[in-house]
């Protein structure tokens, strides 16, 4: 979900219990980018849900961050996607409730009109909110069955709270009163509040602070809540819990912090109604965070609808137009039907539709991803090369007893297929000695089998690592191939080790292009210089020095072309014994070459002198012969002169 670095930053942020909530939230927004908010929120959800954090201040900070991540602004609430007409329009019948209140302060009555949309599975109850005071005491109620309420100082909206003695609960149908209703992390608030309601006081999971604060997140936070530190909120909650003597809603004011926290007591039945309220409105709202990652909200929660009627109930003090459920006419139906909701429906995955997937097949479904068979057209002769060689050997010894194999025998043995299958195994792992000998024998009989083996430059490094001898035998057969340059280039660019040097040393025994071996030596020197680990560097330098000495000793390379580069390499690693030996070897080789050059020059000069002397002697002899011949035959001299 998040890496260890972000997790450490998040845990340090949860420990800042001495800072106000809004400061912590600002630090959170500056630390994590907007694209990571949902991911970090999921991490907070997980550590709270699984109980990885138990300190009350840390849990409060986590709840506040989850609450503030998707707190809607006024501009968002006024947009078309979040308008009250599109969000607050269920499929059930809607009614309007009009209530007249008596003001106890000035003994005058002022009408208060509240238009709300009511879900079909709830009934309205008479409320008596006050429009002047910020905190309502229990004595301000005008009816014994009415629900006490408090005024939210943030939005100046009167929010009812549930009482244990009430039979029904009222839910205000206004998006401004439920900013968390569109928060994808709402299930954690409901689940943790359910734990507190179900847990006893002696239970280790019981936390009176969360039991008091979580209902505020589900409705509306007080005005100065974000300006207080988690420690101050915990102290206020503890004092509020100690001073509460009744089950009705009370307001606690401390002299040091000047903040009011309404003590809301939510029963389990009212929490289920809140769940239904949330689930009814879930399909009508698009969460941008989930839509951006490709999750569409296709799950619609259908609840059975009921019909409602409107009756007028006059009283002595107030005149109220109350909606009464038709179930009240029948005593057997005078109960609210609680629809059981699974915990999975409130989890993250409730936003994503579940598809029924077919059962996996019995065979391994991933075999086709990396096929081990190199498919290709393999044409075999009526008689394979091995069978033909066997017949030829038999014919020399006993020609009258030749048994020609049957067609089934000749077609069942395909040397191309055998070499290709063994090469595929050799690339993936080590072969047995018998399999290595089988590949060598097949390619010795028919060298063209190396072209059908399926070896590519991409697979060559794996073959060198797993089966060095097979790589040597195959490359020796491919040395005249036009693709050999690609193979050797791959061999040069792969990681320098003993196996690759062994392959190059074996290839150096045949006629290679003159630039291949110097190119590989240059690559080895560069690799040694780039190694950071000292021990690994010394080991590689020793290996390279021994390799170059073996090439010089076998007269495979001419050190003149690499004299400066190798000499610099030896001087750089002069503390290594093998480097000193290589330095002496290249100097001795250079001196020997110079001596041989001088000797050859002197020998050539001596040879030229001897040739000149011989020519002079020959000329003298010819002249003497002519004189002798002239004395005997004077006419020949005259003819020769003419």
From Swiss-Prot:
Span list, region Disordered: 78-167, 589-627
Localization in the cell: Cytoplasm; Nucleus
Disruption phenotype: No obvious phenotypic change is observed.
Biased composition (Low complexity): 589-625
UniProt-listed Pfam families: CNOT11
Keyword match Transcription: yes
Keywords, in A-Z order: Cytoplasm, Nucleus, RNA-mediated gene silencing, Transcription, Transcription regulation
InterPro entries tied to this protein: CNOT11 (IPR019312)
GO biological process, one term: regulatory ncRNA-mediated gene silencing
Gene Ontology CC, one term: nucleus
Domain of life, per lineage: Eukaryota
Keyword rRNA-binding included in the entry's annotation: no
Biological role: Component of the CCR4-NOT complex which is one of the major cellular mRNA deadenylases and is linked to various cellular processes including bulk mRNA degradation, miRNA-mediated repression, translational repression during translational initiation and general transcription regulation. Additional complex functions may be a consequence of its influence on mRNA expression.
Complex and partners: Component of the CCR4-NOT complex.
Family label: Belongs to the CNOT11 family.
Name of the featured protein: CCR4-NOT transcription complex subunit 11
Species assigned in the record: Dictyostelium discoideum (Social amoeba)
